[in-house]
Swiss-Prot record:
This is Probable glucuronoxylan glucuronosyltransferase F8H. Involved in the synthesis of the hemicellulose glucuronoxylan, a major component of secondary cell walls. Probably involved in the synthesis of the glycosyl sequence at the glucuronoxylan reducing end. Residues 58-469 are lumenal. It comes from Arabidopsis thaliana. One of its GO terms (cellular component) is Golgi apparatus. The lineage of its organism: Eukaryota, Viridiplantae, Streptophyta, Embryophyta, Tracheophyta. The gene is F8H. Its EC number is 2.4.1.-.
Length: 469
């Protein structure tokens, strides 16, 4: 026995009820308040779109309210340019890749630039245009940028630092075209004697608040060969000063046993711009792994040392005939046009750990592959190099192809995206006049950070001045 129970048609009942309500509203408002009817139907039909609009507006305004609370300098560095990078990429850059300090904070720091006789600086540029454009020309660029900088003071009594503009890397007297440093120590010693005779500031602090540039192989040791650099060491009269040098390692080394800042080598900004303008229109990089430079098939034993510790020779022998490796031992003036076509740019050590390839590859969008154990990269406290480069141990150079293939299959696109951020290019290039966030600006930031640590020296100087008065 079964009961045949018919369920009421709920849907139809609801529809009729709804229709009845609407009819009542229509009848009650006929010839009267038609606006209420419009509002009712508008919200009934478009409430989903209205809800999405309100939520979007909320998240949009919340994003910018958070942005306003971020580092002002980081925002300015990123807001002055248009970028096609995604929001996650931008967040990565702002949070970790570049840590910056607002330029306004530099207003409390003053630098006095000595007006030395031209024989210490300008005469070298007059003798050779290369003095202001070759890879060691940071000494010229920094000097020129400081002359027009807001931190410069014409009153030495209010200075926190004293900049000594001596160009030691412009003596192009060698047969290979590289500058000789044989005169560097005597030229610097002569400059210090001049300061001691004509100004009271060097003697007052023993040079501890004076800044020099050493933009060549082994920095403050002023020698191109490491064994000789170590043997001669840092000139005694400079051991209390601050050295801006391209040489830097993470381990103890006689040539950096002085207060110093590791800076990038000089690359002319105009040459970078020209290379970018001549890059393939489609942005295609048809060279997978690139290196052009000195590579010895049979490296010579020079005082027990081999050029590049044999790393470049190992690269040549292992990958010289490989299709995906573009290796060339000969010089080519237009080699930057090859960098903009390359995915990976090999940066092995030479006699010294650093090379201009580090900067050239990074600013031209080619991933720098650093092969130099223990190297200290420029501005490592502010520029997060792991975000824009690879590091391969010297002992692993024979596995280089596998390393690059792994990166290409995993995080290559993220590294390339970071490299395209203008903040990186700006941090590694020198401009005259200085631009916020460029290489000279980061040098000033490093000096500014040192002020607290050096405040006792400043107070000591002021106390001594009062005694003298």
């Amino acid at each position: 026995m079964s009961l045949d129970i018919k369920k009421p048609n709920i849907t139809k009942t609801k529809k009729k009820k709804t229709g009845f309500v609407v009819k009542m509203q229509l009848n009650n408002n006929r010839g009267g308040n038609k606006r209420n009817i419009f509002i009712f139907f508008f919200f009934r039909n478009y409430y989903t779109w209205i809800l999405w609009f309100c939520l979007s507006l909320y998240f949009f305004t919340s994003y910018f309210s958070v942005e306003d609370q971020s580092s002002p300098s980081s925002i300015r560095l990123l807001s002055n340019h248009k970028t096609s990078s995604s929001l996650p990429s931008r967040a990565l850059i702002e949070s970790s890749a570049i840590k910056t300090t607002s330029i306004g904070l530099f207003t409390g720091m003053k630098i006095y630039v000595y007006d030395l006789p031209a024989s210490y600086n300008d005469d070298w540029v007059t003798a050779s245009d290369r003095c202001a454009s070759h890879l060691f020309a940071a000494e010229v660029a920094i000097h020129r940028a400081l002359l027009s900088s807001d931190v410069r003071t014409l009153d030495p009594d209010e200075a926190d630092y004293f900049f000594v503009p001596v160009y030691v890397s412009c003596n192009f007297s060698t047969s290979n075209g590289f500058p000789s440093l044989s005169h560097a120590r005597s030229l610097l010693s002569s400059a210090v004697d001049f300061l001691s005779d004509h100004y009271p500031f060097w003697n007052r602090s023993q040079g501890s608040d004076h800044v020099f540039v050493a933009s060549h192989d082994f920095g403050a040791c002023f020698h191109a060969m490491e064994d000789m650099a170590i043997e001669e060491g840092i000139p005694k009269f400079m051991k209390r000063s601050i050295i801006l040098q391209t040489f830097g390692v993470k381990y103890k080394h006689p040539c950096q046993e002085v207060e110093h800042v590791v800076i990038p080598p000089y690359i002319p900004p105009e040459s970078v711009q020209k290379a970018i303008e001549k890059a393939p229109v489609n942005g295609r990089r048809d060279i997978w792994a690139f290196f052009r430079g000195k590579m010895e098939v049979n490296p010579k034993n020079i005082s027990g040392r081999f050029y590049s510790k044999g790393v470049r020779t190992a690269i040549l022998k292992k990958f010289g005939g490989r299709r995906r490796f573009y290796l060339n031992r000969h010089r080519f003036a237009g080699y930057r046009s090859e960098i903009v076509r390359s995915v990976f740019c090999l940066c092995p050590l030479g006699w010294a750990p650093w090379s201009p390839r580090l900067v050239e590859s990074a600013v031209l969008g080619c991933v720098p592959v650093v092969i130099a154990d223990g190297i200290q990269l420029p501005f490592s406290e502010t520029v997060q190099w792991p975000e824009i480069s690879l590091t391969v141990a010297e002992k692993d150079v024979r596995n280089l192809r596998k390393v690059l293939e792994h990166v290409a299959a995993t995080n290559l696109s993220a590294i390339q995206r970071n490299l395209h951020e203008p903040v990186f290019k700006r941090a590694l290039l020198y401009n005259v006049p200085m631009k916020e966030g460029d290489a000279t600006w980061h040098i000033l930031e490093s000096l500014w950070r040192k002020l607290d640590d050096r405040s006792y020296r400043r107070s000591r100087v002021l106390s001594q001045r009062e005694v003298d008065m």
